[in-house]
């Protein structure tokens, strides 16, 4: 699809436009966090512990006296950073396994797909938590754990598409022109798999945000004292009946990010896969 046509269809999709606006807002906040945050997110004020939202602290403070607005702003960085790392690992790995197994078939397909089935047979979140428990807490380890449990779905999707197109006239014509091997896989087969993979990724990112928050909630995400939405909810759970806003505010941020990715995924599906309309 030409890029200008893609942009035209994207502008006509309200869901995609809303999702892009929400994602752009999150990226803007993450990039300019030092200028947007009113104070240092790790600065502790013992005299202002568990302070309610007010003129001094717009969203209140946590149990250590840290400004919640500043920590909420800085929390976008590990959230989007983890999403970016998972995307960089998951999409190439899943497409590589799926394209190789679908195109070559035979023993290559059997080995790759059996390994894929083994990974898919395990509960995704439990497997991710187990990986992080073995590797240790941290942003990179969390991204690796989530990526290792996410790529099989992309591999199976790419494999099914390649099997459907393997004997098409399009690929037969390319092979008759002498286009084979890596050139065929990258130049002709990969572009056929990308649209559906991008749509699936956009829809999966909402779940990845929730899984990342779950890791932070259990203390397996970003290392303290780095601001992280899941860890902020865990801190707020201890005083949720009296100072409910400490957990509700980062929960609202997670909801906003998930909604933005879901809307973007729905819009991209309408644009890149019109047969779903």
Label each PLM-derived region with a short phrase.
Residues 149, 195-203, 244-277:
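C-terminal transmembrane helix and the adjacent membrane-cytosol boundary/short C-terminal tail
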Residues 6, 21, 25, 29-64, ...:
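Hydrophobic alpha-helical transmembrane segments of membrane transport/permease proteins
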Residues 68-103:
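Transmembrane alpha-helix signature in integral membrane proteins
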Residues 58, 62, 68, 92, ...:
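Generic hydrophobic transmembrane alpha-helix motif, especially the helices
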Residues 1-24, 263-277:
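Transmembrane alpha-helical segments of polytopic membrane transport and secretion proteins
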Residues 131-134, 146, 161-162, 211-253, ...:
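Glycine-rich helix-loop "coupling/hinge" segments at transmembrane-helix boundaries
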């Amino acid at each position: 699809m030409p890029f200008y046509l893609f942009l035209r269809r994207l502008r006509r999709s309200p869901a995609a436009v809303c999702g892009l606006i929400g994602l752009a807002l999150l990226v803007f906040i993450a990039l300019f966090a030092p200028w947007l945050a009113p104070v240092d997110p790790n600065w502790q004020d013992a005299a202002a512990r568990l302070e309610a939202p007010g003129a001094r602290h717009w969203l209140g403070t946590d149990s250590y006296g840290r400004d919640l607005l500043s920590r909420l702003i800085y929390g976008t960085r590990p959230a989007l950073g983890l999403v970016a790392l998972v995307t960089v690992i998951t999409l190439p790995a899943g497409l590589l396994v799926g394209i190789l197994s679908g195109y070559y078939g035979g023993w290559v397909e059997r080995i790759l797909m059996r390994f894929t089935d083994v990974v898919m047979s395990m509960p995704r979140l439990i497997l991710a938590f187990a990986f992080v428990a073995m590797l240790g807490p941290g942003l990179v380890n969390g991204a690796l754990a989530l990526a290792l449990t996410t790529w099989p779905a992309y591999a199976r999707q790419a494999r099914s598409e390649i099997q459907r197109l393997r004997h098409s006239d399009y690929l037969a014509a390319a092979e008759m022109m002498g286009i084979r091997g890596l050139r065929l896989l990258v130049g002709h087969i990969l572009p056929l798999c990308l649209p559906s993979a991008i749509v699936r990724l956009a829809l999966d990112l909402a779940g990845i945000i929730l899984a990342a928050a779950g890791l932070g909630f259990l203390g397996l995400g970003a290392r303290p004292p780095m601001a992280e939405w899941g860890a902020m909810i865990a801190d707020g759970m201890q005083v949720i009946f009296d100072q409910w806003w400490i957990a509700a505010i980062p929960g609202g941020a997670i909801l906003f990010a998930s909604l933005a990715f879901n809307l973007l995924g729905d819009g991209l599906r309408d644009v890149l896969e019109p047969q779903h309309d």
